[in-house]
Amino acid sequence: MELKSTNKAFGGEVRKYTHASTATGTDMTFSVYVPPAASLAKCPVIYYLSGLTCTDDNAVQKGGAFQACAELGCMMVFPDTSPRGDDVADDDAYDLGKGAGFYVDATADPWAKNFKMYTYITEELPALIESNLPAAPGLKSICGHSMGGHGALTIALKSPDAWASTSAFAPICNPTECPWGQKAFAAYGVDGAAHDATTLLKAAGAAVYPDILIDQGLNDQFLAEQLGVDAFEAAAKSVGQKVSIRKHPGFDHSYFFISSFMADHVKFHADALNKKAENALVDVAVTDDAALAEFAKTAGKPIT
C-alpha cells in the first residue's frame, strides 16, 4: 500500500493510497479521511461508494463529509468505482466499463478478468484498511450515491452482520427494472436479483436493520426512469423494514445535493457504529467468563 498524497482537514488527514489488488488484478486507488481521534484510539469506518463515471476524488473534493467525521470520530473510506489501466476492458458508453463497476463480480468476458468490485469492497478493502490504518476491527458502515447507493444497499442487505448500518443518496434501488441495471447485469453476466436492493429486501421477509436512511432530490433527472425509490419503499413496507426516505424539492442528482445532507448520514452511521460497539462490550462482559475471571485477579491491584 503506497501513500500518494496527504492533506490536512478539520484536524485530521485526507490520504490517497494505491495498492495492488488481488481481487481485480490491477492497481487500485482509494482515499480515506483519518479523523483526529485516530491519534488516540482506533476509529469506526464509514465506506462511501461513488456513482457512475466517478473516481474516489469526486466525494473527497465535493462531498463535505470531513467536518462531521472529525467531530464524531469516524474514518471515511472512498474507493474507486472500477478497476482501471491500459489492459482493463472498457466501453464507449459512460454506464459500462471503467467508472461503472456496479459493485458486482463479473463472470462474462471481457469483464470477468478484472471487474470483481463486490469482492474488492466486501473483503479485500476492509481487510486492507483494518490491517494498515487505525480502524476498529469489524466496526464499519456503508453508504453511497446512485450506482454507489445501489452498491451500499445491496452489500449491506446481503451481509447484515458485517455492517452496522447503511444509507444512500438517490440510489438505484431496483436495478433489474431500470435501463442502467439491466444493461450492466447483462454485460457483466451476473444474477440481477442477487444484486437488487428491492428484491433482496423482499426476500429477507423481515426488517434487516433498525433503520435505513435515503435522501432523494425531487428534481433528480434520473428519478423516474432509473432509481426505483418507490419500489424500494413499497418493499420495505411489505416486510416491516423502517426506511427513512427524505424527499427534497428542488434538489437534483449532483454533489450540491449530496453535500447538503452528508453530515446527516455521517451522524446516522456514527450512532449505529457506537451502538454496535456498546453491544459488543456487553456481549464480552456477559459471555467471556474467562476474561472476567482474569480481570478479577487484578481488580484493585497495581499492574506491573
Model-derived regions: residue spans:
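Non-catalytic cap/lid and distal C-terminal segments of serine-dependent acyl enzymes
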Residues: 1-304
